[in-house]
Amino acid sequence: MPALAVDAAAPVAHAFACDAARFPAPLLGPAAAAAAVAEKPDAAAWSADLSSALYNVDGWGAPYFFVNDDGDVAVRPHGAATLPGQEIDLAKVVAKAAGPRSGGGLGLPLPLLVRFPDVLRHRVEALNAAFDYAVRSTGYGGRYQGVYPVKCNQDRHVVEDIVEFGEPFRFGLEAGSKPELLLAMSCLAARGNPDALLICNGYKDDEYVSLALIARTMGLNTVIVLEQEEELDIVVDASRRLGVRPVVGMRAKLRTKHAGHFGSTSGEKGKFGLNAAQILSVVAKLKTLGMLDCLQLLHFHIGSQIPTTALLGDGVGEAAQIYCELARLGAAMRVIDVGGGLGIDYDGSHSAQTDMSVAYSLEEYAAAVVAAVGRVCDRKGVAHPIICSESGRALVSHHSVLVFEAFSASAPGRIDPATGYLLDELTDDCHADYRNLMAAAVRGDFDTCALYADQLKRRCADQFKDGVLGLEHLAAVDSLCEIVARGMGAAEPPRTYHINLSVFTSLPDMWAIGQMFPIIPIQRLGERPAVDGVLSDLTCDSDGKVDHFIGGRHSLPLHELPVHGTRGYYLGMFLGGAYQEALGGLHNLFGGPSVVRVSQSDGPHCFAVTRAAAGPSCADVLRSMQHEPEVMFEVLKQRTDGATAAALARAFGAMPYLSFDPEAAAMASGESSGMSSDSEGSAAGAAEEDDDEWEFMRGLTV
């Protein structure tokens, strides 16, 4: 587009101020002015309740998370039954965990994973209560007896807690691999209910099947679920060799299909399960072997995050029909395992429109399952079976919160008055575009402004590539166009907040499958969040960002960062207790977070930290990739003096994430080592510290 003649006087470049406040504003009508005021209310009029509504905390967080009167995110560890004196302020937990030891804190580096075992207990109790109510209210003749699929979160304390909390309900475990089976066997043997089910899923070899049969000899209620027809031969051979009669289940491949991205394992082309012909073949083989009484369980799975009870009812009804057919064929059927699929509401919409939510409650899910099984069994005249579910996501998602710090943010565009003259040095065609842009701005002509801003930027970029303009000219033009856009009322582009976190390690589902989790500030919620931001992690990867948020947002309302040296700006990622820890990788060798276990107590802050552990150190993550930190340290130490070697030892022992603790930074640089800068002092220090340098590093590793 050629430069147009200037039809209004425009000021010279350096007459403009550094921000949009000094830009000539367009005239606004009363309606537009009212809308602008509504969009940017006075910060004093803001409240914690408004923040709660803005982030829809009650939608996705109830009954566990809410915004308290102090403007902090708080936790109700016992759900709706939590008393006012039992609520836990998450910001106070972070202050305790990350605060310096000299001030009574634990000195743990961030990021920080906060576990709430009381929430886990409440989830176990709520799931069992929902099914118990559905059974009693409908006169169902069986009972509910669930299992926790350990793949959702294999952390020792999580699994042990679930078994302990579930013991009164005969709650068991599900394993899908040999290490998971060993984990489940030891945990159930130590603290489980003798009647608790141990469901063995996944592909199997002789060693896997032998472990499962050994578990039966230990008195564990073990069921080997056939995923493939040929697994039956392995089970029969192992049982004969060990002299153990197995209890067998089958996974059916249903026709019912779940269309969401969590439903790829459902339908006739699903990854797992036996079709109708294969089911009949297994029954025939068992009958020939005189082992048909060993077949006692039917399992199916139509996908995680089942969106509606209508789809759930279809799948359960189809499976119940197969269950009844197996009973008719002579199998000693007693359990129907409905698999996973009990979803949670990540975005708080309570709808089936996206994969981020479900259109039912826990109670409605249980009622739909019980009704579907009971209806089919009644029609077929088959005794009501034990109902089992593998509801991992619904159990563990709420129990942990990932807390991380935003340590810097990109600055909005500005023009330095000292460099504003650069705009007057543009070439003639660029300068004509510039003056036309200014004239349109004075008139309040938004469309023409946008046109000339785009043309000016493109023309200047071309001339920069040709070497006509310098980098300073390019920066001045970019800043000017950004300020003009803001002055014309255009939405300010989101600012990038840099976070002390690895998305690949702590939020793997977010970049891998587009899963969204609620992310909000955990404090300052009594203040209006005046900045729209996106999050960028520490990794050297363009995928290491968060720019999609619940509610369809492409930015997150945030606050201006605190002045350097004051308290940090902490964000929390919620509902991530399932899968994220197991799936996280070591991109750029960033390891996992520090972890604290927090229980409700009668203390002054209503909580007690019952377990704390710093995250993996640099040495730990290097070792996981087959490096030898001890050897690396010795090689490096040969080229350093004593003070530097001590700093190296501390670096090996520290977490890979950034540290903003001045004392820690001084220690790492050797400023607090007490070492002299002269060579004699350094040599003496090296001699004194030679024996304890590596021990100091080893003590810092987890």
Curated annotation (Swiss-Prot):
Pathway: Amine and polyamine biosynthesis; agmatine biosynthesis; agmatine from L-arginine: step 1/1. Expressed in roots, leaves and stems (at protein level). PROSITE patterns: ODR_DC_2_1, ODR_DC_2_2. Its cofactor is pyridoxal 5'-phosphate; Mg(2+). CDD domains: PLPDE_III_ADC. GO terms for biological process: arginine catabolic process; putrescine biosynthetic process; response to cold; spermidine biosynthetic process. The keyword Zinc does not apply. The keyword Magnesium applies. Keywords: Decarboxylase, Lyase, Magnesium, Putrescine biosynthesis, Pyridoxal phosphate, Spermidine biosynthesis. It is an enzyme of class 4 (lyase). Residues 668-702 are annotated as: Disordered. Induction: By cold stress. Substrate binds at residues 336-346. Residues 668-686 have a biased composition (Low complexity). Its EC number is 4.1.1.19. The modification N6-(pyridoxal phosphate)lysine is found at residue 151. GO terms for molecular function: arginine decarboxylase activity. It holds the Pfam family Orn_Arg_deC_N. It catalyses: L-arginine + H(+) = agmatine + CO2. Belongs to the Orn/Lys/Arg decarboxylase class-II family. SpeA subfamily. This is Arginine decarboxylase 1. The gene is ADC1.
